[in-house]
């Protein structure tokens, strides 16, 4: 698969106005999103990526085969992405008390008595790292010398086992480097995914993925000015088809024209998106 992209920088004071404009353009309300993004670096030579490691056998076969083929072409940085909720930030880990265990045991095979209402749960929200879903996302360095004024690159993704992701990633030849969070809003316009977002840094560095997340006020924007990034992306299944790639590019140009009074969508610097592990 190929991914075609255009980007724009959005000043903080323009963020709300652009959200309203995108909502009107796409005829939908913004879908707010938080993501954890873990960065891993390859240390193993190409051709040695093993796609059958423990629980990873549950991963969709076709996706992983395609991803494995791309990863074997060289050594790259890659990212593991996991969706989270705003309530997950600052939430404690789940605990199972003796009372909870007794309740679970007594509830096995015993239904609630007729006419007795269950009391609504008053327990605080908890973040369970062991149940965190993950997706591995590979992005190649953008193609050089493309005639079209869009960023084009090979891409692939595959679902991963939930929970602790270090074991399968290390087994595939990847070391954990760092992680950050992304906050933003998504819009869909035909085949274009529009993501208006910003990068958030954690208050402290970690040598492995965090099992708990700090409170949101402790997170700091990468851009101290508070600016956002507008990303417009189209995924093309058959990147070898020049006609399909041309049509996708034209769709992005159409969006650029519609938003030209608000932002300047343009292709990114190729080397700034270089994912090769040196």
From Swiss-Prot:
Keywords for the protein's UniProt record, in alphabetical order: Activator, Nucleus, Transcription, Transcription regulation
Primary location: nucleus
Domain of life according to the entry: Eukaryota
GO cellular component, one term: core mediator complex
Compartments, record wording: Nucleus
GO process annotations (BP): regulation of transcription by RNA polymerase II; termination of RNA polymerase II transcription
Single GO MF descriptor: transcription coregulator activity
Quaternary assembly: Component of the Mediator complex.
Family: Belongs to the Mediator complex subunit 18 family.
Task performed by this protein: Component of the Mediator complex, a coactivator involved in the regulated transcription of nearly all RNA polymerase II-dependent genes. Mediator functions as a bridge to convey information from gene-specific regulatory proteins to the basal RNA polymerase II transcription machinery. Mediator is recruited to promoters by direct interactions with regulatory proteins and serves as a scaffold for the assembly of a functional preinitiation complex with RNA polymerase II and the general transcription factors.
Protein name, as recorded: Mediator of RNA polymerase II transcription subunit 18
